[in-house]
Amino acid sequence: ETVLVTGSKINRTLLQTIPTHCSVIDVPSPADLMKSKKNKTELKGFRNAMLKDGKALVKFYMWLEKAVPTGEVTELTVEEKLREFRSQQPLYFGESFSTIAGYKGNGAIVHYRATPESHLKVDPEGLLLIDSGAQFMDGTTDITRTVAVGALTDQIKLAYTHVMKGHIQIATAIYPQGTRGSQLDVLARKALWDNCLHYSHGTGHGIGHFLNVHEGPQNIRLEENPVALQPGMVTSNE
């Protein structure tokens, strides 16, 4: 008998349950690749989910624009309002992950999380990073955007523009069959690199259909990944 395992993911206890007479082969899970290539029904659900998420975000941004000058907005109220507007949409199930709302320097902290004990008030100046998403019963969303909530320095304007150029390059890229995410990743960074700027985290990742918001095996990042981007895969551009 033969058992397939993914050595980088299986824990020691589970591995030890495999009978000693079995032949163990360490390979990537074939289920991951099959799951990553969404069928027509799943893709339709994703599009519906994105439309609903878009409606919620438009309402949120309208609220944010009016609320920031009042001095009553904090990183925590940003989380609450996003949840409120998304919950008004049909088939809403919950957040796909805990919202990251980082004002000014907090926006540079990867996977930052505001707490009641430690959070910032959002003033009408600088940038507010919002990384958030929702689970709808017909699809999952994950969107990262950085919003100008007031006056910006010239340095911030330039950096923002270079990031936007990279986002557009990924969104409009046309590439041949067999292209890997690591090959596309440079498109997101070129404008930044041309100006001696860089970011150390990934650019995008696979997204599950009403499942894990982070789903492999594909991604878009500097580190080499042998998995090619294929039709049906849903991958974020962050």
PLM feature segments, named:
Residues 1-238:
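Active-site neighborhoods and metal-handling regions in enzymes and metal-associated proteins
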